[in-house]
Amino acid sequence: SEFIYGSLHLFDPIINAEFSPQGVALRQFTSRWEGGMVRTSGNWLRDGKTLILDDAAIAGLEYTLPKNWQQLWMETTPGWLNSLQLKRFSASRNLIIDIDPDFPWQLTALDGYGANLTLVTDHKWGVWSGSANLNAAAATFNRVDVRRPSLALTANSSTVNISELSAFTEKGILEATASVSQTPQRQTHISLNGRGVPVNILQQWGWPELPITGDGNIQLVASGAIQANATLKP
């Protein structure tokens, strides 16, 4: 069996749900989607328009992001979804691709887990609370190949803290930490260190070209603002 809604195309979906005046109890949802499997359960509460997923798992996905995914991320959610909470989530062996010609990227064999994540608040997408860890076997960011990229973050009502952001390059390693405020100005601070890496590796990611070549150690500390109402750019 198939289910098609707009660009959403599910194969062999199984849904077990109970409806009541208080909302919907989703006992089971499983489906094949984009070459992989998705599974979840939880509740939608009419009071507060809150969707709480007790457990969500995604495995074997081969997914290309929509061309306008950055704009979609900025749009408000439908009236029935004021808040989205994930008590637990896991990801295994997923392939995620962005074909944006200005900054294409790909994550191969993406695994991850998280807990108590709030992804929608007041109809706005974001990472508003909780923790997540993600890692992949390999990745490409604007035609720069890296190995074993990993990320660890925690979020609360005031700040998203990235305590680990690292990847191996062809010869060396890049390591970074960062913080982003939850205010509309999105005040951002990043500290990056590279050991034994091409000194111009950041050029492909939007940094000005340096008048030197070869491998070496680099250190970068930067602060700025990522406006909440502006799309992300490299």
Report the location of each language-model feature.
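A structural feature that tracks compact, well-ordered secondary-structure segments
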Residues: 27-29, 41-43, 165
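Glycine-centered tight beta-turn/hairpin loop motif at sheet-sheet or coil-to-beta transitions
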Residues: 35, 169-171
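Membrane-proximal interfacial segments on either side of biological membranes
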Residues: 1-24, 36-144, 149, 155-160, ...
